[in-house]
Amino acid sequence: MTPRAPSILSQWRELREWPPLETNALHVWRLSWSAWDEAALTSAAAYLTDEEFAQAEHMQMAAVKQRFIATRSSLRRILAGYLAGGEYAAPETARALCLQSGAHGKPALVPPRVRFNLTHTDENCLIAVAAHAEVGIDMEAVTRQRPLERIVRRFFSPAEQAALSGLAGDALTSAFYRIWTRKEAVIKALGEGLACPLHSFDVSADGEARLLAFRRPEIDVGAWRMLNVDVSPDYATAVAVRGPVESVSGYTFTPHQHP
């Protein structure tokens, strides 16, 4: 019987040696913006391409610039580490990686030797990596400030709307964000953006993340794997993988990890 990964990622390990990325493994890397001071950002800039550095220099808001440098340099270091055979990569190796955005904006490594996706909020960034299967990840701050009912009517499927009926208060808010992050993760894994209508498929509203139905015959629901990611009670996070997942690992990435 094929091993089945846990349905939730809740443990984060400090990196002591580079983890091997097995065929059906999923790795999720967590970055905390608070760990990036001015010295760390200066060092991180060495991993950016000339184009990325110029892009950062044109950003007017300091917080946006800092997050861009931290995210893009960490992404390059993480991907280069896998491709280097489990070792920290030098800046020139990380800079040499070709990252491109698809027709609907999904970033990818060219050629696609590993697959990845990322999401961020005001406090954290998560980078999901898989060896061969397309992956999508989404993280949202849980708040009641959004017009939840209007979003549900416009974007959720009839089955999802039915799952939310009768809920109110915190129960409704929690279920809404479970559905929303799971749907976003599926869309990001597909790489189609809103060209794939959000109401064209159903995800679960309860604690276990599942893709329940897809109204496109070419998509095999049974081939997908979904799981929750526990970042903090203030965030809802989900990962969708278009393929089998036999193991899940979470790692904390800091700017002080050096080759």
Residue ranges and their predicted role:
Residues M1-P259:
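Core catalytic alpha/beta fold that binds nucleotide/phospho-ligands
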